[in-house]
């Protein structure tokens, strides 16, 4: 039996450092041999970092730094990106590897070949599900912020656009998550705090996604 909890702990501590080695090996400018989704993941990380930096500047009188916010992961218990994207070299329990070499057909443009392992397909699908959840949250939050009479801050289309581009490249069929809506007047202060929390979490996930793509590009 796979020790799920131990695996998750090891993955959380080791995955980013391990994948950062591959990042150092990858080429910055996309070429014909480059893993197709690496360019999208680089754009995603850049947009996430820029949007967070902009929010911290605009909301300078709000608790919006990493030290001030209550960190929250909206994907917790809903996706398994860290586990699914763990490199084979870090897995010691053979029973966890039974399905990793199974061929699987994907429809997305992230892979040069549509034929891949089951675990790689699971990794990419988990990334897709992460992006979908953040996309819905950002759109819902943006709808609230646009109702703010002060018009202090709202998300531009760049970050929403790069999320959509990577999702299209991954091209997994998935159930549509309905956008949350409310007729009640939102608490704009709390909404802006929530935006800071969401942007910090999203940037961390964008780092993970970019390093996964860098690893796959170097593999």
Curated annotation (Swiss-Prot):
It comes from the Eukaryota. Disulfide bonds join 37-110, 64-196, 85-123. The keyword Iron does not apply. GO terms for biological process: immune response; interleukin-12-mediated signaling pathway. SUPFAM superfamilies: 4-helical cytokines. One of its GO terms (cellular component) is interleukin-12 complex. Residues 1-22 form the signal peptide. It is found in: Secreted. Pfam families: IL12. GO terms for molecular function: cytokine activity; growth factor activity; interleukin-12 receptor binding. Keywords: Cytokine, Disulfide bond, Glycoprotein, Growth factor, Secreted, Signal. InterPro entries: 4_helix_cytokine-like_core, IL-12, IL-12_alpha. Glycans are attached at residues 24, 93, 107. Heterodimer with IL12B; disulfide-linked. This heterodimer is known as interleukin IL-12. Heterodimer with EBI3/IL27B; not disulfide-linked. This heterodimer is known as interleukin IL-35. Interacts with NBR1; this interaction promotes IL-12 secretion. Belongs to the IL-6 superfamily. Heterodimerizes with IL12B to form the IL-12 cytokine or with EBI3/IL27B to form the IL-35 cytokine. IL-12 is primarily produced by professional antigen-presenting cells (APCs) such as B-cells and dendritic cells (DCs) as well as macrophages and granulocytes and regulates T-cell and natural killer-cell responses, induces the production of interferon-gamma (IFN-gamma), favors the differentiation of T-helper 1 (Th1) cells and is an important link between innate resistance and adaptive immunity. This is Interleukin-12 subunit alpha.
